[in-house]
Amino acid sequence: MATKRKVIITCAPTGAIHTPSMSPYLPVTPQQIGDAALAAAKEGAAIIHLHARDPDDGHPTQDPAVFQEFLPRIKAECDAVINLTTGGSPHMTVAERLKPAHHFQPEVASLNMGSMNFGLYPMLERFKELKYDWERKHLENSRDLVFKNTFADIEYILTSCGANGTRFEFECYDISHLYNLAHFVDRGLAKPPFFVQSVFGLLGGIGAHPEDLAHMRRTADRLFGKDYVWSILGAGRNQIPLASIGVAQGSNARVGLEDSLWIEPGKLAESSAAQVRKIRQVIEGLSLDIATPAEAREMLQLKGAANTNF
């Protein structure tokens, strides 16, 4: 009897792109972030990708003290793999962005694979009533912002986090980012299996047409062969459609309110767990199985939760 392919669902419950005024369902406080992570894990997310926010006004923070308020609880109450951001926010320095990953030494950390324009300002057209002053600045300032991820930055993250046994979710927003990863593979600084998160539909990166997805996959196949584990992240309204196309073609999937506030056109998702449930239905509808956290650890060759610092 043929063995069904296992599909890893990653869930990103809060992130640093969206702001509290955009959705009443966006987790802000440590309690809310913890609740969202646990609910997503219960629905089948094997990996939880985490950012933190200031509990008073929801602005992104990389203060390890805030992460400390929810990480131990999540680890104690579920077996999901914890993936911490090193992207933080495009408005932060690399040193700021790395504080949580250096301190907590997670099994997985995200790693953005190239500097890029990171255009959030079009959201001002949809969301005109903003509660906090920082929200408008956060969006408007992205018109003249380069999200800095130089070769030196990437090398430093690879070596400093890698020394703690942390492996990476390589976030590739464009074709060039795949070539950047190949450069570090050639230098021996990135080891297989490579967990490649292909990101589609963010202004400044590759588009969200199925042909863009196909081009990403062909390029990754040519560069990495069988040495990579592929995952799809579609931004905004592209989340479920692109993840569905990808899963049908052999990818894993990432969902969550970090990446999209929507559950269907014009309807806000009431939780990241609802998005996990929706993509799980697609996966199981294709006669595939979702990967458990233990299976995800084996697929990605992770060090295990016992070897983290939280």
UniProtKB/Swiss-Prot annotation:
Alphabetical UniProt keywords: Acyltransferase, Metal-binding, Transferase, Zinc
Enzyme Commission number(s): 2.3.1.319
Cofactor(s), by name: Zn(2+)
GO MF, any single term: metal ion binding
Role description: Catalyzes the condensation of 3,5-dioxohexanoate and acetyl-CoA, forming acetoacetate and acetoacetyl-CoA. May be involved in fatty acid biosynthesis rescue via triacetic acid lactone.
Family designation: Belongs to the BKACE family.
Name recorded for this polypeptide: 3,5-dioxohexanoate:acetyl-CoA acetone transferase
Organism this protein belongs to: Paraburkholderia graminis (strain ATCC 700544 / DSM 17151 / LMG 18924 / NCIMB 13744 / C4D1M)
Gene: kce_3
